[in-house]
Each structure stands twice: as C-alpha cells, then as structure tokens.
Amino acid sequence: EEALQSLDISSFGLLFTTVPLYHTYDCDTIQISPFNLSQQYSVIQETIVNSQNRYKNHKLKTNFHAFFEKDLFVANTNMTSKNQILTYLCDLLQVKRYTDAGFEEKVYKRENASTTAFGHIAIPHSTDMDAIKTSIAVAVSKKGFQWDNNTVHLVFLLAINKADKKTFRELYESLISLFSNDSILQEARSCTTFEEFETLVYSNINQE
C-alpha cells in the first residue's frame, strides 16, 4: 500500500488491489485474488459496471444546474409530434441566446440521419457542437410524442459547446442510463414542474 502514496489516486475511478488496504481512498476499491482470475470475472465485471454508473450519475448531479434550468422545461404540452416539440425546444434555447439561428436546421439534419429515440426517451442534438452555451431543454409528456415509429415521453434536446465535448458524451450516457429504468421513466412522465423533475433526478441518483 505504500506504493499508492506516490500516486494521484484522485484521478482514479476504480482501484483493484490484491492486498488489503487500510486507508480510505477517493475512488471505488475492490480486493481480488491474483489467482483464478477467470473465476472472479463476474464480480470484476459487476464492479466495473457499478463504478461506471456511479461516475455517470455523479457527473449528471454535479452538472445539473449548469445545464438544466426552469426556463428550458415544459411538461404535458398539447404538442404531440416530433417536429412540434423539436421546434418549440429549439425556440426556447434561441430565446435564451444559448444557440444561434442555424441550430434548429442542424438538429433536424441530425435527426433525419437516424433517429435519436431510445425506447421511450429521445435525445436529439445538433450535427455540430457549436452552441453558445451548453444547455439541455426538456419536454415531458404523459401521453407521449410521436417520434418516427416510437412514442417518447421524455425529450432532452442537447445544445453543446465544443469546449464541453467530453461532457456531452458523459451527459448523453448518464441520461440514457438513468431514464432507461422503467420505474424512473414512469415517475418522470408524471412530473409537471421543473422542481419535481429536479427532485426525481436527485433522489434516484442518490440511491445509486
């Protein structure tokens, strides 16, 4: 364990060790045997997946107020189609001056290339990371929006500044990971205010 003292453990996400550790480190740790690694494969794999999920949730939690806001949230609107809600959310971002006039066209260009729907959620975004400010506009619908061949109940329109390229991938994966959980999705469908949505996100992240 003395060898670890010279390392920057703060940059570690997960630490595997073959000896007991007597100090607390700011990362997930797991002790494994150096022998019969194949028999420990499932435990190692589960540990990696759980650590990755905790990391994604941590990034979503720490970035929540940086990218989500009340003025970019709409719930149970009368809009029912993909085009209606996309145009509306694009307008919200432009009114806040987080995107320029060409943003909407690039969102549709990306959408026409292949759908951004996954099950009952959709995460549309521009073909370019040229947003003035990285932000996420959210639409929630109990009835759902017709999204190509899917019915989606949650739409996250991502506007990404190129300076946040890494954050884009992390947020993308975090949103899919969290709202792919059917029980969380069902709760989200019932959100009528930004505050309810925020509480839902935080409460489920804290359970991880």
Residue positions per predicted region:
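Cytosolic covalent-transfer regions centered on His/Cys nucleophiles
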Residues: 5-10, 14-208
